[in-house]
A protein has these predicted regions:
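Conserved alpha/beta-domain cores
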Residues: 1-170
């Protein structure tokens, strides 16, 4: 069985609260506002006892924010465009390991949600695979909230099929 890691969404919480969570054993923190995250990253980088923090960008990415994301984050969970992936690749410092990438999928087809449409994942995955400073790690989806358990299972089953398709193609 593979390990499961908890990603604590730390947006809107300050560095002091993150430090408390870190002391309790939490290591992965998700942010979706770049400026807010950079302030926390800087504050916590000055503290040696928090040197194992893993920063995850979980929000939408604007082109003008790719450089700080590439320079300060370990993971990006919201890639939906080749242009953003390319900019992250180009901005990722060579001294850092490749940036871990998840392709965001709009499994429920909601107009208000970001993400690629199911069935279009191969092209973006192929493109990311050709970028040496990025490492494709998986797919990410946030389906619509629904009390219908069958519909929830359907959405995640579709995501699982997409994952199998990518694995079969060597991703």
């Amino acid at each position: 069985m593979e390990d499961i890691a908890l990603l604590a969404v730390s947006k809107t919480f300050g560095a002091a609260r993150i430090r408390e969570c870190y002391a309790a054993g939490q290591r992965a923190f998700g942010e979706n506002y770049v400026q807010e995250a950079l302030e926390k990253i800087a504050a916590l980088a000055a503290t040696p006892e928090t040197d194992e923090i893993e920063w995850h960008m979980i929000g939408p990415i604007q082109s003008n924010k790719t450089r700080p994301i590439a320079e300060h984050f370990h993971w990006v969970h919201s890639i939906e465009r080749d242009k953003i992936a390319q900019r992250l690749n180009d901005a990722r410092p060579a001294r850092l390991p490749p940036l871990n990438i998840c392709i965001q999928v709009n499994v429920s087809g909601e107009a208000s949600k970001s993400g690629i449409a199911p069935g279009t994942e191969v092209g973006l995955a192929d493109s990311i695979a050709s970028m040496p400073r990025l490492r494709l790690r998986g797919l990410m989806a946030i389906p619509e909230p629904t009390p219908d358990a069958s519909l929830r299972r359907q959405r995640f089953a579709r995501l699982r099929e997409m994952q199998k398709n990518l694995i079969a193609r060597g991703h």
